[in-house]
Structures are given as C-alpha cells and as structure tokens.
Amino acid sequence: VTDPAPRHETYEFHARTHPYALVIGVYNEGEKFTRQLEALQSYRTMVDIIIADADSADGASSPTALEHKVRTLLVNKDTQRGLSVQYRIALAYALVQGYEGVIMMDGNGKDGTKALPLFITKLKEGYDFIQGSRFMAGGHHENTPIDRVLGIRFVFNPIMRLACGFGYTDAMNGFKGCSRAFLLDP
C-alpha cells in the first residue's frame, strides 16, 4: 500500500503496538478535545491513537501537547481542507502502517468514548463496517443542539434509509469503524 494522501506532516511518538487504530479528526476543538483525549487514555491498552489535525491554532493538538498521549499526529498541510481530507490522510497512514482496522471519531467530545471496546470487538469478530448511533438503545450524545438532533432523526435518516435501502438510525454519526478489507475494497 502506498500513501496517496494529501500533503501533511507526520509526528510519530512511538511504534505501532496494536492491530487497531483510533483516528480522531480535530480542528481548533480546544478544551473539548483535551477532555475527550483524557477520557480515551485508558483505551491506549487496546488501540493506537492517531490524531488527524487540520492545522489547528489552539495548541490542544500540538506535538508537545500530544507526544505522551497518542501514537501519531498527522497535520494537514495541503490546500485541500475539511474533515474528509484529514480522514483521507489518516486512513492512508493507517493502511501503510498495516492496521487491521480503524475506528474514527470526531474530536469535539460529542461521541461516547465508552463504546470504543465494542467497536474493537466487532472488528475482531470480522465485521467490515460499524456505524455508531446516538439514537439506538444504549446510544449516547452530548452537546448536540436540538435542531440538529431533530434534523438527523426526522429528515436526514429517513432520506438515507429510502435512498440506500438500509435501516440507518444515525447516518450522520462520525463514530464508525472499518476493517482493512473494507478500506481496500475498490
């Protein structure tokens, strides 16, 4: 696998230690990201944490702030911007590094980090794609504005169900997992 990712800087703080990576996309998330990363530290025994940063200026995702908390920091230096570009960089990196699967979550503190072991379990069981949901039994969301919740539940999800023929409960959720096979499938 070659690295077809947009231009970026890579800061590797230690070697790969797990078959799965947790990729967190951030851009000036500040204290929300700092609190989320602290909550994720206990999971470093299960996954390598990779930060995909859009060249934030808030300092929360600087190399000095992260060097003892994550495996790798990837900083987008390309003219292309947006969360999808950050994930392209991180997924290409994860494939080059040989990870068996990748779990993605946004760095805004809105995803329930306690579900991370379930994602790892499902990847180990052979699932190729796992989609998080804030709206299923046991689902969780924090700090999501009510107009966004209503729009997702009663506008976007029904449209996605109709278009895809699949019973999505939260197609907008950025908390998802993918196997290596899924990522490499043309």
Give the label of every model feature segment.
Residues 19-21, 48:
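Cell-envelope/extracellular polymer assembly enzymes that use nucleotide-activated donors
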Residues 46-57, 75-77:
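Short beta-strand/loop segment that forms part of the nucleotide-sugar
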Residues 78-96, 113-186:
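Acceptor/aglycone-binding surface of glycosyltransferases and processive sugar-polymer synthases
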